[in-house]
Amino acid sequence: MSVPQNISSEIWSERLIDRLAYAHDASMYRLVPKAVIRPQNEADVQSLLAHANETKIPITFRTGGTSLSGQSLTEGIMAEVVRGWQHHEVLDKGRSIKLE
């Protein structure tokens, strides 16, 4: 896998150490993602979604990683949205979220 078009290599990592850091949550499960991205803005998320749609690689968005059942893990792309996002809004009866 290589850095997708329109995504900065500064926020995209395929380094094993980064991938292993996101292979665990508070559960007993271990899934190693193909890549880790730390999107900084809406454009990064749009580019990531376009890439995932094109390549059919699943994305998991992770904030705290506190799941006890493995929901915050993936063997696809891990999108860590902990830093830089100041506001959120839950939409569509909890089916989506808006981050700013």
Positions of PLM-derived features:
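N-terminal glycine-rich flavin-associated loop
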Residues: 3, 26-59, 80-100
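Glycine-rich beta-strand-to-loop/alpha-helix junction loops that act as flexible
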Residues: 62-66
